[in-house]
Amino acid sequence: MRRFFALLALVLVAAWSVRAQSPYESSADFAKYAMKLREQALLKVEPQVFVPTTSRASITRFPWKTGIVTTVFWIGEAAGGNNPVPNVKSSWDANWTSNYGGFDTPDAGSRKNYIPVSFVPRQNPFYVALPYNDVTHGQFKPEAALVIPWFKQAYTEPGRSVCKDRWLAIRKGNRTAYAQWEDCGPFRTDHFQYVFQNERPKPNLNRGAGLDVSPAVRDYLGLQPTDVTDWQFVEVRDVPPGPWRNYGDNNHFVIAKRLTEQRVVQEATDKKKKE
């Protein structure tokens, strides 16, 4: 600000010194001349300020995790091979399979439009697992409030996960899918240094996998059973239209649509009563 007033004073002094030789004879003409000099000076010193959009801000806040070994898992998956824990329940839902609506078969011949052909899922078929759980024995882990960027904003009550249902972008080549965080793994539930900080995934039975994705994510990105992807956290407002918005009682977009429909019905009912 001091720089601005000093510059303005110099401009006015320059303007007065030029007035004697200026072609502008009237005071009105001279005032216009002085203002023009001021505007030219401001253009030279005022910085160009870039105001980021909401989307750009969120991308800056949550950087991409690149080159992450990615494996496929599914709701109802039995234990076996390199999967030591069955996926009948999740870290946050003891009735995961029944709440989803059934077995989320990975068999491509038994799927259509990213969902099983045998039923309509009651939760989002685009889901993932990351190797961190913010809750243990019904309480938040000591580091949770310190390492989870959105902890304060998402907190609702003691021991209620602020990670469940969080949105991620998963990128393979020129395609990006969006999914919700619904389970913890692969293999670990304590690696916050990777999930929220800068460490790489730790070695494990699946080539150091650091991300599990559902059959829907696999199909959208064209992934192999074990592949490599990039991922990042995203805000709900930055999730674009796509098949990940279509299903699920846990899906923010489905919830918003239902609330809108309920409001329209209620408004129509209230209007009819007044007639």
Residue ranges and their predicted role:
Residues Q21-E275:
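Secreted/periplasmic proteins
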Residues A6-A15:
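Bacterial N-terminal signal peptides
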Residues W16-A20:
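Sec/Tat signal peptide C-region and signal peptidase I cleavage site
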